[in-house]
Amino acid sequence: MASFVAELGSEHSLALASNTDAIHLAFARENFSVMGTFQQFFLSYEMALLKPDPAYFHHVLYGLWASPENCVFIDDRPENVRSASNIGINGLVFESIGKLKSDLESVL
């Protein structure tokens, strides 16, 4: 997974959108080098919002200075993907690396 994320990061700007807290984020940054691939972080504990709240995704779009149709949101929770899709973001449910690669071909 880390190598695929790094490959994506070499061609696209990547942001991490996570329902997390400061403790888990610090652990991830210390233990998973893939975290360095992301240019921006949208973290629930900093935003005081949680996915799948549509306001969460509006906040992300504002932070990215991006329109929904120019973004792809990938998550393993269908309700989060549905919420992002409802405001126009290309949403993909993560099930496996192979399926994700195939799904990304249709939106990138």
Predicted regions and their residues:
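Asp-based, Mg2+/Mn2+-dependent phosphohydrolase catalytic module
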Residues: D21-A22, A26-L108
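Short, acidic loop-to-helix structural element flanking the phosphoryl-transfer center
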Residues: M1-L14, P54, I97
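Generic beta-sheet signal
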Residues: L14-A15, C71
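Conserved phosphate-coupling serine/threonine residues in phosphotransfer and NTP-handling enzymes
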Residues: S18
